Structure formats: C-alpha cells, structure tokens
Amino acid sequence: MSRPNWFIALPLPSQADWHQASRSAPPALRRFHPADLNLTVAFLGPCGAARAEAAWLALAPYASAAPSVSAGSWRALGPAQQPSAYGLLLDQGRVELERLLAHWGAVALEAAGCAASRRPPLPHVTLLRPKRRESAPWMQPMQAWMATAPLPSQSLRLEHLALYTWSRDRSERLFRIVH
C-alpha cells in the first residue's frame, strides 16, 4: 500500500442524512460511507503523521468556529472531460466558509510544511466517485441525473475540525478520524 494521505476537515454530524441524496445516482459510481462525509479544509497529502499533527495543532484554536450549512446544488468535480468526484456545493454558509477555508487551509498547509494551495476554496461535500480505471460511460447519465437529483433539505451545523487519514480497511470506509 502506498503512503496514506492526510487531511483536515469538518465532518458532517452523525445524524446528517445527506448520503441519502446520492442513493438514486447511476450505479457505476461508488458511494461514500455516511461517516466519511466531510468538508475538506486542507488536503495535506502523504506528509506523514508528525507533519499532519502539526497542521492539526495549528488549527486547534479554530476548532468550533464553523457556520451552519445547507446544500445548494450538485456538481461534477475534477477535470471536466472525466470528473473524479461528484458532490454537493453549499448554499447557506458558503461565503463565510470560503473565507474560513482560505485562512484555515493556509495555516494548516504552512504548519505541515506543505505547498500552498493554488486553487480557491470550493466549499462542498463529496458523495460519489467513479470506480478507478473506468472509461466514462456514466458521465452522460450522471449529468442528466444531477439536473433533477434531490438535495438534502436539512441544514447542518459543522461543529468541529477533525484530522483524517486512510482507513485501515478501505473496503467499507475510506477514512478514519485520528483526532
């Protein structure tokens, strides 16, 4: 197995039902486990545990400052020709989160000794990914599905930051929370 990636994120509360919105998506896509749903603050990559811990500690003072959020629309993420993920963009809380993510992300990346992000923050929650090494027969059905797909009606309070890495058994859950 390659070196695990690390990231800091705002986990969706355990009572959130946002994963239900992806149930009717084309079956060729892999659905995230409800406990894996999060809003990424800083992707640290394979930086190692010590550097990830430094990033986590740098963000500790901000741990409870996130706003309430609501889903706004579905979006394909990654390259337009072959998206790498599908998720929900945020409506309520989006502007405040863009500001917070820009600041928090910069603090975390610097503390971990990682390069600064070149992309502006895009507050979203990823729910679906294509299965690896597949051609894209699901792209057109997915575009049609997103045009009419349900949105979660429940607003959520993102209550705390968490440090994530890969799950030890990725067959069920992709990630595990370290802190």
Predicted regions, residues:
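Histidine-dependent nucleotide/RNA phosphoesterase domain, centered on the 2H-phosphoesterase fold
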Residues: 1-179
